[in-house]
């Protein structure tokens, strides 16, 4: 136990010390991408290139994200007509604007007419002979999923300085619009070389095969452990704490206040997500940070979740004992809701809207309370919560578990108070029966079974991380499908944030039925919808096909089938989905997270009598980009190793004989490797932030 404690303590301390050390090694003076300058201001409007730090030379097109802010209203300018033209300065001759503020009327038809605002000195904007700005070569910039953000298609073929010329067309006094002109400089950089990282990743992937084989060899040659792992509940302070009636309320109260604050700020504060604490707390800090708890402590977040607490409190007050119909006691409702919300974020930009964020959170509270009034215990958490199924799957990776010490003692106990409850405590709120529990999927360490078990037959102990993936006896199609589909969903979430994404969607749209739509933004959204739902179905079908191939390679045994193999081997993809979520959220947490500090200052200054300093909206990141790229690569390679190992262990359990077990898993091993390499390539591409 002492050695084990030292290992865990050393790993934790090393992780805490290594992160700032790596950050300092790479320098801690650069700033969060997208916040380096104030752009250009013309009249009451501010213009900024949101993703100017992620523009690199590439073969395909990408989109410049132009943000337009109405300074009088302090909010993004939505629904405007914007024309833009990326230029290379050396290719244009500076022409001065004509004298006078009001040009003469003309029938010049190469551009919109109306009045204009002169661009700043040194402009490369051209002027027509009639004294109006020449807008030939300008393209319409459709509004993206976030209000006030306009997409300018651009082919970055040359490295060096560029200009983005912008024309904002506003309603004029007559029939012709008023034209506001400006230009924004930006640099096209050389792409960060993929060769070194790609070769490193390929080498590490091959090494993962070797390590997985070695781990299997050691696993089957070593003698079994003669002593049980140390029970953490033998620590008096931990045992008292988890058995205390205050164990859950003390953890839930701060998050209940925090979620209430998020709802309130989302409704009353600024609609700009990068200046509203609600979206930063919810999507940048909470959602990105809570995923790390799944790896370390399984479903521990659920014991703190105020939404689950609201459902359970309501159920107790109402005395509801009803259960969902048996056909609905699956993960399918939760899976459908999670996919629907993920798609809606890509379609409407939920995470970039404080108002929508507030209403979604309020809707979750309302749904949890309604289900608590109608159904027993935490029915909402077990079967309906959109992230409940995802948390359950990822919790299988956690290196801790709560299990019975002895199944014989459980079988000899006729009362089963751990499930039914008694005077000392309530039955399991997640409808788990500890005697049959063989995974972390639905246990969130609420401590109720510790209070009700008179024989003290429960142990909280460390175990091999990911052990549930290959040891649990009960496997279900809904869990296996979610495990595989999450690989596709996580990849889509990451792909939606990389710089070439809009270029890919534009190229794909040209092949789809809605290619002729004049509304470019709508066409882009329809393409995203098609790609999202197709990938959520296609990836599971590919895994099913791998199972069909494995079934044929092993001689088509009668006792199994491609369907049964899908249900068994689908769990091997859990580490890949988790790793992609972690890798995708690392930049959000460590690059966008620092913005929460000045926004918190702004919020306190605005809504309280206290002044805690002027906010600096240009904070330094918590970790530098090179460090994050290294961490992303390591996370994916670790997941590759775990998935390979899990697939091999499942293969040994499925076929037993070495001849068959070495033949059967190869389709899965090859697919796991291909998915990992695709994700590594995706994360090597420039990625933009959600909040600017």
Residue spans for each PLM region:
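Residue-level marker of alpha-helix boundaries and capping positions
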Residues: 27-29, 372, 440
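Aromatic- and glycine-enriched pocket-lining scaffold segments that form the walls
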Residues: 441-445
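Bacterial N-terminal signal peptides that target proteins for export
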Residues: 1-11
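N-terminal soluble domains immediately following signal/targeting peptides that reside
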Residues: 25-203
